[in-house]
């Protein structure tokens, strides 16, 4: 089923993925006190776009926890390849949370839990109640959650991935994305995968055997498969079996974290226009403040 704008009950925004994009897109933005505010501007610009595009939806923004998660305990090098958050981005996080809340949009961030796992759990709870959910993200991993009730919006584009589009884009059905990453790894998250197994080989193996588990159940058949360096692939799968399943686990988004998130807690609230206006003036967002005074900036807020 295609989810159209009018029947998207919940729009779950992967705030962390937008935070970095906004920061680098507006790196030179500063306020009256010469403090950086590009990430603030970029996040607000994105949120306003979403409010305009999805006026009938309840929007929720989800952020990563700064603390380590279970994945860091499973695999110490997990995401170790990423640079530390710049200090001038850190300074903008609290103001971003502040203004989002005053707009009336709920924020969820849970200690020691990644945004992906919060989104996975929340989306699963909501679709079991027959709601339609759209996840807005720049992260390909979240495509594994796609089903008849959950679709993924790529960034601020109009590209929405349903089950058929996920298969077309990645070559496999949504639920097999962790298996794919278990084999080929994921450089962006420092997930190792199996050495010498690239995307093309991983897709052939998954299409032939159906899942990572079935690949290992039929591993003796691999030398006879019509793939390049089949013997090497066979040997590496044998040698790095634990690494393959560890990588799959690292790439699998949790849908059952123990957290009490009710629909009441994620309901949008009326915006506080006085606080928003003061915020806009503080950060020199004068055009936005003018639109706010005219009732145009928040015209689609509940």
Curated annotation (Swiss-Prot):
Family matches, as InterPro entries: 5-3_exonucl_a-hlix_arch_N (IPR020046), 5-3_exonuclease (IPR002421), 5-3_exonuclease_C_sf (IPR036279), DNA_polI_H3TH (IPR020045), FEN (IPR038969), HhH2 (IPR008918), PIN-like_dom_sf (IPR029060)
Recorded GO MF terms: 5'-3' exonuclease activity; 5'-flap endonuclease activity; DNA binding
Domain of life: Bacteria
Keyword Cytoplasm in annotation: no
PANTHER family xrefs: 5'-3' EXONUCLEASE FAMILY PROTEIN, FLAP ENDONUCLEASE XNI
Role played: 5'-3' exonuclease acting preferentially on double-stranded DNA.
Protein name: 5'-3' exonuclease
């Amino acid at each position: 089923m295609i989810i159209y704008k009018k029947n998207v009950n919940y729009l779950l925004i992967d705030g962390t993925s937008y935070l970095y994009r906004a920061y680098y897109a507006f790196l030179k933005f500063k306020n009256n006190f010469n403090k950086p505010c590009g990430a603030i501007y970029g996040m607000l610009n994105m949120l306003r776009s979403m409010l305009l595009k999805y006026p009938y939806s309840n929007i929720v923004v989800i952020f990563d926890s700064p603390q380590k998660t279970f994945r860091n305990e499973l695999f110490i090098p997990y995401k170790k390849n990423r640079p530390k958050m710049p200090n001038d981005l850190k300074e903008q996080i609290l103001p971003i949370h502040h203004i989002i809340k005053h707009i009336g949009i709920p924020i969820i961030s849970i200690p020691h839990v990644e945004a992906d796992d919060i989104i996975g759990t929340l989306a699963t709870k909501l679709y079991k109640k027959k709601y339609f959910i759209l996840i807005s993200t720049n992260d390909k991993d979240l495509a594994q959650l796609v089903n008849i009730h959950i679709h993924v919006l790529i960034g601020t584009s109009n590209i929405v991935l349903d089950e058929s589009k996920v298969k077309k884009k990645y070559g496999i059905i949504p639920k097999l994305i962790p298996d794919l990453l278990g084999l080929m790894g994921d450089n962006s998250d420092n997930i190792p995968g199996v050495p010498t197994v690239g995307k093309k080989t991983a897709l052939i193996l998954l299409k032939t055997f159906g899942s990572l588990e079935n690949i290992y159940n039929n591993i003796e058949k691999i030398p006879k498969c019509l793939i390049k360096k089949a013997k090497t692939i066979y040997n590496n799968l044998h040698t790095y079996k634990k690494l393959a399943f560890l990588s799959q686990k690292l790439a699998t988004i949790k849908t059952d974290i123990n957290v009490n998130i009710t629909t009441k807690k994620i309901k949008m609230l009326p915006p506080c226009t006085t606080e928003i206006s003061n915020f806009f003036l503080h950060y020199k967002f004068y055009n936005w403040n003018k639109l706010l005074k005219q009732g145009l900036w928040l015209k689609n807020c509940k």
